[in-house]
């Protein structure tokens, strides 16, 4: 029997295929926007910690890139390696799946999760959209057969439905430990990293079907001057055509990207923000391991 008053702290990996709701789930658990989201697969590229401290419990969530089948480019290999690494040395794994849809990429994640030694929680997302819950049963039964030791929790990452039950299960599995981070810290990532991610999110949301995935963002300046935070961001693409798409007709699109990113930055950093954006062509960066490392993508 666990001691409900004990101080507990541990790492919780959130894994799943691309675009299944992992980052949205993390944001709702934290009660604020930390991880960027869009309707496009592979929005998340890096592991990022989201830290939630409530009383004696500190859960350190690891938001991961969606595992996907393509290893075509160095960037794809980096994301898959990053997501797989998150399954090691964590105390709990949350495997996020769709309420009924199952893909080859879900199967890929399942095959990795089946080797996990510790507690696994299956978070069945978007269950609020099903009126007749009996429709879920065949899928849930099959999932339970694949992961017989996993606990199953139906949730809605978008609406925040049933997250209390999910967090209760997580807390139960965290080891007794002193807290690793101060109570008011919510992430391990720098403000520069968060600013770059916000710009990239707005690009992904603005471009829709025109979206070139070969885009990254580098913060060249991040400086507080008086009451204003000055941020210079460089948007890196692979081709001249992509540069033209991002800039848009008479610069209208990049202006919208900047306005939306600035609004979110002012909320996140609690400061007036002066944001300047530039676009640069760096051919083949997404398949160049040296370039990826220089842009903060770590070891491949």
Curated annotation (Swiss-Prot):
Positions of the UniProt region annotated as G5: 155-157
Coiled coil start-end: none
Compartment annotation: Cytoplasm; Cell inner membrane
An MF annotation (GO) of this entry: GTPase activity
UniProt domain Era-type G: residue ranges: 8-176
Ranges for region G1: 16-23
Domain KH type-2 positions: 199-283
Region (G4), start-end ranges: 125-128
Primary localization class, coarse: cytoplasm
GO process terms (BP): ribosomal small subunit assembly
Region annotation (G2) ranges: 42-46
GO cellular component, one term: plasma membrane
PROSITE patterns linked to this entry: G_ERA, KH_TYPE_2
Annotated segments matching region G3: 63-66
Alphabetic keyword roster: Cell inner membrane, Cell membrane, Cytoplasm, GTP-binding, Membrane, Nucleotide-binding, Ribosome biogenesis, RNA-binding, rRNA-binding
Binding positions for GTP per the UniProt entry: 16-23, 63-67, 125-128
Superkingdom as given in the UniProt entry: Bacteria
Membrane topology (UniProt): Peripheral membrane protein
Subunit structure: Monomer.
Stated role: An essential GTPase that binds both GDP and GTP, with rapid nucleotide exchange. Plays a role in 16S rRNA processing and 30S ribosomal subunit biogenesis and possibly also in cell cycle regulation and energy metabolism.
Family: Belongs to the TRAFAC class TrmE-Era-EngA-EngB-Septin-like GTPase superfamily. Era GTPase family.
Name of the protein in question: GTPase Era
Native species: Pseudomonas fluorescens (strain ATCC BAA-477 / NRRL B-23932 / Pf-5)
């Amino acid at each position: 029997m666990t001691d409900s008053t004990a101080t507990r702290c541990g790492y919780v990996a959130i894994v799943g295929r691309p675009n299944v709701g992992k980052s949205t789930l993390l944001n709702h658990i934290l009660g604020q926007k930390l991880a960027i989201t869009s309707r496009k697969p592979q929005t998340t590229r890096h592991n990022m910690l989201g830290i939630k401290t409530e009383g004696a419990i500190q859960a350190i969530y690891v938001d991961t890139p969606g595992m996907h089948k393509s290893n075509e480019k160095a960037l794809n290999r980096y994301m898959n390696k990053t997501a797989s690494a998150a399954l090691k040395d964590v105390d709990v794994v949350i495997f996020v799946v769709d309420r009924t849809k199952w893909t080859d990429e879900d199967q890929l994640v399942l095959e990795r999760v089946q080797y996990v030694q510790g507690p696994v929680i299956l978070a069945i997302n978007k269950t609020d959209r099903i009126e007749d819950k009996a429709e879920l049963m065949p899928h849930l039964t099959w999932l339970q057969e694949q992961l017989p030791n996993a606990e199953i929790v139906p949730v809605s990452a978008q609406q925040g439905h049933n997250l209390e039950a999910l967090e209760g299960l997580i807390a139960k599995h965290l080891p007794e430990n002193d807290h690793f981070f101060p109570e008011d810290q919510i992430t391990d990532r720098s403000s520069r990293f968060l600013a770059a991610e916000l710009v990239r999110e707005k690009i992904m949301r603005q471009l829709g079907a025109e979206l070139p995935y070969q885009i990254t963002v580098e913060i060249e300046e991040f400086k507080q001057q008086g009451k204003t935070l000055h941020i210079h961001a460089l948007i890196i693409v692979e081709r001249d055509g992509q540069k033209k798409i991002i800039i848009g007709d008479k610069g209208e699109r990049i202006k919208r990207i900047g306005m939306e990113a600035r609004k979110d930055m002012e909320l996140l950093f609690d400061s007036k923000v002066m944001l300047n954006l530039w676009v640069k062509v760096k051919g083949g960066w997404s398949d160049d391991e040296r370039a990826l490392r220089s842009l903060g993508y770590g070891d491949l």
